[in-house]
Amino acid sequence: MLFFHAMGVTGASSEPIARYLQDRYFCILPTSTVYCEGQKYVSKLDEIRQVEDFLHRQGVERLAMVGASSIGADLAMAFLTQTKLPVEHAFFDGGQFAQIGKGTRRIMTPFLYFAIKSLYWSKGGTLKKILWCDDDSIKSYFIDAGKNLTYTNLRRQISDSLEDKPFPPLSKELQKHTYFEFGSIEDHFKYRQAVMEAYPCGHYPVFEGYNHMQYQIRDPKGFAEMLAHIVERDCMPELPFIRK
């Protein structure tokens, strides 16, 4: 299983989930070069190349699942359309499928930079100002990411992410095994209709009353079991909070 993380955190943010999957699956949790000390973000294609090179060196021949959270959806979608590895399933948790103009993204960058850096400077104290929760269990991932973040790397990432252009094509076959999940009260829910129109053969579960990435943050074991169920049975499990 390959996981693409959200904005402002490191790949380790998927470790609470991976702990419940590691006995069954080889879990790969790369951190974007944006949040790596001394590394230079070049482009989405370069990020994908680095991931592909690692998978090749490890002898990975197929992926049971590609998982992506928030803005990780942007990189995951690029990976899915570029990789030559067979991908059996994909799951997007609150995917930030925003299509934002170049000028707006340029304006956003300094605000995002100071928001993420403030998490490092305040040791996570400002988390509640930018996220619906400030659980201690997730603060360290934001602090570690903020420590290594440079303005130049963030600017480069935002320059080729969330672009105002059509979503990349996914084969109908992969769409049939792809799950685009949103919480009913999260801000990213507004992207759902556009994604449904772009990928009509996908699955679109709604977690009623849930906020952005709430299930994986508050119940990583349940989230992990859900992913395993999808891989092993090719369908969502019966969860009491899924909108009927």
Q: Whereabouts are the PLM-identified features?
A:
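Conserved HGGG/HGGXW glycine-rich cap/lid loop of the alpha/beta-hydrolase fold
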Residues: 1-37
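Active-site loop/oxyanion-hole signature of alpha/beta-hydrolase fold enzymes
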Residues: 28-65
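Flexible "cap/lid" loop of the alpha/beta hydrolase fold
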Residues: 81-118
